[in-house]
Amino acid sequence: MCNYQLTDFLPTTKKECELRGWGQLDVILFSGDAYVDHPSFGAAVIGRMLEANGYRVAIVPQPDWHGDYRDFKKLGRPRLFFAVSPGAMDSMVNRYTANRRMRHDDAYTPDGRHGMRPDYPSIVYSKILKQLFPDVPVVLGGIEASLRRLTHYDYWEDKLKKCILCESGADIILYGMGEKNTLQLCRELENGRSIKDVKDIPQTVYLAKKEDIPGGITDTDIVLHSHEECLRNKKAQAENFRHIEEESNKMHAQRLIQGVDHQFAVVNPPYPPMTTEELDAAFDLPYTRMPHPKYKGKTIPAYEMIKFSVNLHRGCFGGCAFCTISAHQGKFVVCRSKESIMREVKQVIAMPDFKGYLSDLGGPSANMYGMHGRNPKACERCRRPSCINPQICPNLVTDHSKLLDIYHAVDALPGIKKSFIGSGVRYDLLLHKSKDEKSNEAARQYTRELITRHVSGRLKVAPEHTSDRVLRLMRKPSFSQFYDFKRIFDRINREEGLNQQIIPYFISSHPGCKEEDMAELAVLTKNLDFHLEQVQDFTPTPMTVSTETWYTGYDPYTLEPVSSAKTPREKLAQRQFFFWYKPEERASIERELRRIGRPDLISKLYDGVHYHGRAHYDPKAIGSSPERTDMREKKRKSFNPNFQPRGFGTVSYTHLRAHETTLHL
């Protein structure tokens, strides 16, 4: 049993600092999340990393931004800087739905309580700190600032906004995964440099006059259209984004410079991908893997979801158009060593309430562990946003052998009854036929072992749509591959006597998607016996190609016009097709099908049965009715008692996938 003392956690109060014998702190970190001392929570990662390098660091979780600002004053003035992060998710995604309605809960807050963070904490916290301590540097990190490092469209305010440094008053952004740039900034300031002079650290963003940019603006820099020009011309914003995304995905990027408010936002290129040893060091820090004792007796939903999970790698080369993982973690997959993974699994086994079931052995995508470019030189020249779309790159090693070895080693540990894969699986990697037969055999073995040993009753996959035209805009594989994978899934279930479900995720109102596409999606998924549950409206979030397409009306790569559903009526007209099986939706769906000239789909959806105001539930359909779902759960051969079918709260699944495994300042 783990018996942790208060001093085993990073301090959050003056008293806790005194218990450690600390006077002035070096860095004070303000976070929009509750403090959970776990490698899936960015404040803990950065805090532990600084602690390991000899710095005195404290965390102020979810400070009260009202009244006299006592939470911002209580730890005094740090020696080096204040660090500000909104938390593991974009604060606006966390607080609002795709329809801009306020959510009623917050998964990163004790007991899911709503209202413990403001809109845009990066801005609110920074302004307060600058008001109270104008001469102390304020450093922004985390997903919110990272994805707002240049001119970006803000869906919640429905306007184009400047680099977040302009509005927040902060001094610098440490974008992406924050271990290296944060530590380097500490060393530079400790050596006596002023924050205004620190302009050479990779993976940082700062504001400067033209004459103050180191080396001046050179031919190797990419000078983007200014913020003011983007306000006048949406096509300029679309053109900008192609450069921004390409430089985010390159091994050796160029410096980006954008004019704004008579100065320039300068984005220094990122560090090279971390090594396995560097990633191990981040995960091997002395985390307690528990919420701070101040939350005793309370439940933090996000922690409950991942407390028995282990992250295997960072980065994702999928390049999905609506996802921010590659923009924040990078395109190149960096894997932990087997030894580091096994150490963490043993820590989980030692947890007092662990019952033998690992809820996830995964990452941003479950089955990219160990995959890399066969020829590293080709990767160094590559600027593709995806290694697997529109086709899988011939240079990509898609061998699942290393991942299988991890699974086997984990499952062989005493105390492990089952390890489940809760992260999304890329079935296009499983179906890929490479020239290496060993790799093909490993993919077949992985597929069978995944289904027979690692599915907690339901396997999550993300086809996202059925229209190949829409899927091309999403950078997702053809829906025909989902058919192929489902046939394999069903066959293995029959052979093994299992009764598992495959749960597909879909998005409506994505740029380029029309009502007719959604109507055909309804027919195709009906024919596959699905009554869809895991669905959502597309939510534009900063720094995705889908968002730029949605806002500008142009594909950033081709500059061809792309239409999008934007008004509530247009979005509802698409979303209703997910729920064709609900009696209250039928009349509206039939009206819409007649309006768009597709009355032929009415008989396909409803089998020619006249509408009598009552739903027809197919007993074979997944999610057909609550009674059917309960019955299946009782019959499951591989039932996971930790499984939470609805995720946590009402946070949209796309953004959970984007952020739930990120570790950042």
Please provide the spans of the model-predicted regions.
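Flexible, glycine-rich loop/tail regions that form catalytic "lids" or insertion modules at the edges
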Residues: 459, 463, 501-503, 508-595, ...
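Flexible glycine/acidic-rich beta-alpha junction loops that bind and position SAM and/or redox cofactors
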Residues: 90-99, 147-149, 179-184, 209-213, ...
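Conserved alpha-helical substructure of the radical SAM core
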Residues: 329-354
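N-terminal [4Fe-4S]-dependent radical SAM core
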Residues: 2-24, 34, 239-309
